[in-house]
């Protein structure tokens, strides 16, 4: 490979064979330039590459043809052309001598790299590598960006987010990238909505569909710097205006109008983006999102929390893991105070997706520079820093063309004593190419995740659309069929919930039939048991027959005519009273099940079907409730009849009852049988006695009477009793005993009870034998007590006193219950409890069966018929099928978003197979 000087020397020597010597060097040079462009090295050579290729493409074609043609005439023609082109080669190399040296030097160091095939293909297409990839991928992402703006923030697309404080030069950077003035300017907060800026590189001039309102006044000379035809090559389109084209002055005005329309006339902000597409042959394919500039102090017409609002908006955008952060910081301020870098570090602490941009490098104090920052020595960023020079306010006022500014920017960097060493890594053009390369690579890397997001969103909206259903048909026959289908489906799912055959699996709670079974097995049994086990104070929580005190049993025994046994009639009466107490809880069971059935009717499984038609839903619930309440009324009557049937026949021949009876007979027949300690209640106050005697024994705290003698009372018989009250009790006892004896003699002749089987059937029931006690063993205290009783009795007879209401029979304490009575009371209560268990079990089981048969099963059978008979009417179909407006709006939204997502998925699928995704 010859040096540049040798090339120049050879090109001036006509004796050198042009065909064999000069053209191979040109081919190598072209390959070098293409390789250089591909790697974005020596950015200053870019603008010469197309010129170089165009100048020698024709000659190369002649050269290639000459290799395949041995005709002497053609060779003579080529030699003649060679002589004519020598001058052009010399002129070109002389003008670009310095460029040529750099290019050839870079080519020498890269001879081992093999890019020949790729370079030749790029050369044939006359395109650079990055332009090809960017032009193919970015339009797809831009289209997705537009759809994402319409769909919402549900897709995390790869995009470059421009972040910076006010007056940081953010707007100037964007305008430099576009090469046009198009952003509104002014004091305070100007950018008040996100601006999605999509740059499309065009290659041909289009005169179609140009905005008819485009003005061609003197202002166009400012926006069209080169010639008047540029207005046809460059234009803008907004996402909210369709395909209408705008020139750059109109773009600025439309941004202001659209911002004020959404964000209001004051200085408030809005998160709804503006989508702007700019078509120009001068731009690099790129997508940027310009956000409002950070501010610290709210000015006039701004809300006081404007700073927090802007920060929150910026965080929402840069938190997207697929976004690239373009953090803009003015170089004439301390880098550690950069608001943009501070926010970027919050979401990207490692700096893997942050590009730092230093603006206003020309405004730094003399003797200072930002070379350490640009080289990454101060703040390390994986994507590095890029320095740029913006137009000054005077340049803007003087309408200095941006192309002239870009040339001045390059000249300033090239002549700077420090920055000239890294000129190829500075400037607006380098920033554009760097962003293009990073974004293009990022798009390729995030394609799978974006495609997966779109797939998931399609699945979600299809599911939502299925819930909202198809639009209502217009024909009457189709409407009637739809109504019938809804009623049938409603009834089917109701049956499925009760039977446990619902397709939807619920794991967080009992549902349908499982809840009903739980109510039967747990809640229902505990409720009826609590109603049957009422304590003596009628507060609940005691034992069965807790409402029946031992004193009442003693009185019942004595009222039966004997102190030794009780007739069957008294036993039956006590059992019936106990069964009557559970009648209401059993009836309430059907009401509990009714509430559960109503809950199932409005269950979430098919609530979405009814939510479409609020009138139909209301009527279905009304008809269903009426049908269920008819059933529950019949069910309650059957439950009440069942209780009456249980009370009508007290079956003392039940095997379980006989088993308990035999056990009691066996245990009580033993001579050593003793009534368990504490098996008797220590109070005579009952639910039937409104007052309690002052002589009754106190009830110990925390006592649980009659828990199978496991929790006995601690009876304190030493409780002091007033002497006068005691004397009155003794007098009452004597007179009452005489009355009882007379009644017993009469009743024993007429009645006999089941307890006679325990104590015999003689006219005088036997009492447990007790050894006679000699008189000398009786205590002197007892003798005195007997004498006092006799004296009091005689005194009462003389006074001809009668019993007052306060001397009621239930006021007798436990002291007057004999051992025989204790035994009888104990045995009687145990038999009552034994039969109560049998009766309670029968009632609970039969109640569950009646509720299942008459309410649950019957509701499954009649619900569909009731709904069709009541609602399937041709005259009311239109009214019943009137849709909820909210459902209609949501369905239309789903259809719209599904259409956008499916188009996006199609675009991604077509691009996924493109070789351009695999070139990097």
Swiss-Prot record:
Region entry G3 motif, spans: 290-293
Biased amino acid composition, Low complexity: 681-705, 724-751, 775-790
Pfam families reported for this sequence: Dynamin_M, Dynamin_N, GED
Ranges of compositional bias, category Acidic residues: 212-236
Ranges in a coiled coil: 724-751
Subcellular location: Cytoplasm
Residue numbers spanned by region Disordered: 65-84, 204-241, 680-790
Annotated GO CC locations: cell leading edge; contractile vacuole; cytoplasm; membrane; microtubule; mitochondrial outer membrane; phagocytic vesicle; plasma membrane
Domain Dynamin-type G, first and last residues per copy: 154-448
Cross-referenced InterPro entries: Dynamin, Dynamin_GTPase, Dynamin_GTPase_CS, Dynamin_N, Dynamin_stalk, G_DYNAMIN_dom, GED, GED_dom
Listed Pro residues bias regions: 765-774
Biological process terms in GO annotation: cell-cell adhesion; cell-substrate adhesion; cellular hypotonic response; intracellular distribution of mitochondria; mitochondrial fission; peroxisome fission; peroxisome localization; phagocytosis
Ranges where the GED domain occurs: 825-916
GO molecular function: GTP binding; GTPase activity; microtubule binding
PROSITE patterns in the record: G_DYNAMIN_1, G_DYNAMIN_2, GED
Region ranges (G5 motif): 389-392
Binding site for GTP: 164-172, 359-365, 390-393
Annotated region (G1 motif), positions in chain: 164-171
Residues covered by region (G2 motif): 190-192
SUPFAM superfamilies per the UniProt record, alphabetical: P-loop containing nucleoside triphosphate hydrolases
Keywords: Coiled coil, Cytoplasm, GTP-binding, Hydrolase, Nucleotide-binding
Entry's family note: Belongs to the TRAFAC class dynamin-like GTPase superfamily. Dynamin/Fzo/YdjA family.
PANTHER family: DYNAMIN, DYNAMIN-B
Function: Enzyme hydrolyzing GTP.
Name of the protein in its database record: Dynamin-B
Organism, as annotated: Dictyostelium discoideum (Social amoeba)
């Amino acid at each position: 490979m010859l040096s540049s000087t040798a090339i120049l020397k050879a090109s001036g020597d006509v004796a050198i064979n042009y065909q064999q010597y000069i053209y191979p060097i040109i081919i190598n040079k072209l390959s070098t330039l293409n390789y250089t462009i591909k790697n974005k090295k020596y950015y200053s050579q870019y603008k010469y590459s197309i010129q170089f290729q165009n100048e020698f493409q024709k000659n190369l074609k002649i050269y290639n043809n000459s290799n395949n043609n041995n005709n002497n005439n053609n060779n003579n023609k080529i030699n003649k052309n060679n002589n004519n082109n020598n001058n052009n080669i010399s002129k070109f190399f002389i003008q670009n001598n310095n460029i040529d040296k750099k290019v050839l030097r870079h080519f020498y160091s890269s001879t081992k790299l093999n890019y020949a095939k790729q370079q030749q293909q790029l050369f044939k297409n006359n395109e650079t590598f990055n332009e090809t990839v960017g032009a193919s991928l970015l339009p797809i992402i831009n289209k997705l960006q537009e759809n994402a703006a319409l769909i919402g923030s549900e897709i995390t697309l790869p995009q470059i987010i421009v972040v910076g404080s006010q007056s940081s030069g953010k707007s100037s950077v964007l305008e430099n990238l576009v090469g046009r003035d198009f952003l509104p300017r002014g004091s305070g907060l100007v950018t008040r909505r996100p601006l999605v800026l999509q740059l499309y590189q065009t290659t041909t001039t289009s005169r179609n569909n140009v905005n008819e309102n485009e003005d061609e006044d003197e202002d166009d000379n400012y926006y069209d710097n080169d010639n008047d035809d540029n207005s046809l090559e460059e234009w803008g389109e907004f996402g909210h205006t369709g395909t209408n084209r705008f020139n750059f002055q109109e773009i600025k005005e439309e941004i202001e109008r659209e911002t004020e329309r959404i964000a209001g006339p004051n200085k408030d902000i809005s998160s709804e983006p503006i989508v702007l597409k700019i078509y120009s042959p001068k731009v690099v394919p790129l997508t940027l999102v310009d956000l409002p500039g950070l501010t610290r102090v709210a000015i006039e017409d701004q809300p006081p929390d404007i700073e927090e609002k802007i920060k929150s908006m910026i965080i929402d955008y840069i938190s997207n893991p697929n976004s690239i952060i373009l953090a803009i910081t003015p170089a004439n301020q301390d880098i550690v105070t950069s608001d943009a870098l501070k926010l970027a570090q919050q979401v990207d602490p490692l700096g893997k997706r942050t590009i730092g941009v230093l603006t206003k490098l020309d405004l730094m104090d003399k003797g200072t520079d930002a070379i350490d920052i640009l080289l990454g020595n101060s703040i390390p960023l994986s994507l590095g820093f890029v320095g740029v020079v913006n137009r000054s306010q005077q340049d803007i006022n003087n309408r200095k063309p941006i192309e002239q500014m870009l040339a001045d920017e390059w000249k300033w960097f090239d002549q700077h004593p420090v920055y000239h060493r890294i000129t190829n890594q500075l400037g607006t053009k380098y920033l554009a190419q760097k962003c293009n390369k990073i974004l293009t690579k990022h798009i390729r890397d995030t394609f799978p995740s974006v495609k997966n997001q779109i797939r998931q969103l399609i699945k979600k909206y299809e599911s939502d659309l299925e819930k909202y259903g198809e639009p209502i048909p217009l024909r009457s026959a189709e409407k009637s069929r739809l109504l019938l289908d809804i009623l049938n489906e409603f009834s089917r799912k109701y049956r499925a919930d009760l039977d446990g055959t619902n397709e939807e699996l619920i794991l967080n709670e009992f549902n349908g039939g499982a809840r009903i079974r739980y109510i039967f097995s747990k809640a229902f049994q505990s409720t009826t048991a609590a109603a049957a086990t009422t304590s003596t104070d009628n507060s609940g929580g005691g034992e069965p027959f807790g409402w029946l005190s031992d004193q009442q049993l003693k009185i019942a025994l004595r009222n039966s005519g004997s102190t030794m046994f009780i007739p069957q009639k008294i036993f039956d009466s006590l059992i019936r009273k106990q069964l009557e107490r559970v009648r209401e809880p059993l009836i309430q069971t059907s009401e509990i099940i009714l509430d559960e059935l109503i809950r199932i009717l409005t269950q979430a499984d098919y609530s979405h079907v009814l939510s479409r038609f609020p009138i139909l839903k209301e009527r279905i619930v009304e008809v269903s409730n009426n049908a269920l309440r008819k059933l529950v009324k019949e069910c309650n009557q059957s439950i009440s009849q069942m209780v009456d049937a249980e009370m009508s026949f007290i079956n003392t021949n039940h095997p379980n009852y006989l088993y308990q009876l035999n056990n009691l007979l066996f245990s009580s027949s033993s001579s050593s049988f003793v009534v368990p300690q504490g098996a008797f209640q220590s109070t005579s106050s009952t639910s039937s006695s409104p007052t309690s005697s002052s002589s009754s024994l106190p009830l110990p705290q925390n006592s649980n009477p009659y828990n199978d003698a496991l929790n006995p009372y601690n009876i304190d018989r030493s409780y002091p009793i007033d002497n006068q009250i005691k004397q009155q009790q003794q007098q009452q006892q004597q007179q009452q005993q005489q009355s009882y004896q007379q009644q017993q003699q009469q009743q024993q002749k007429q009645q006999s009870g089941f307890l006679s089987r325990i104590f015999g059937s003689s006219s005088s029931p036997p009492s447990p034998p007790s050894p006679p006690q000699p008189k000398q063993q009786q205590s002197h205290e007892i003798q005195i007590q007997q004498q006092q009783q006799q004296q009091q009795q005689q005194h009462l007879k003389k006074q001809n006193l009668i019993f007052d209401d306060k001397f009621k029979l239930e006021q007798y304490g436990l002291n007057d219950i004999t051992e025989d009575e204790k035994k009888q009371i104990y045995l009687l209560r145990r038999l009552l409890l034994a039969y109560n268990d049998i009766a309670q079990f029968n009632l609970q089981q039969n109640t569950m069966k009646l509720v299942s048969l008459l309410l649950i099963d019957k509701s499954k059978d009649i619900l569909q018929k009731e709904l069709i008979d009541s609602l399937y009417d041709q005259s009311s179909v239109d009214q019943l099928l009137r849709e909820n407006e909210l459902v209609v709006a949501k369905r239309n939204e789903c259809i719209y978003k599904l259409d956008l997502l499916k188009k996006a998925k199609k675009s991604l699928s077509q691009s996924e197979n493109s070789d351009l995704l695999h070139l990097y």
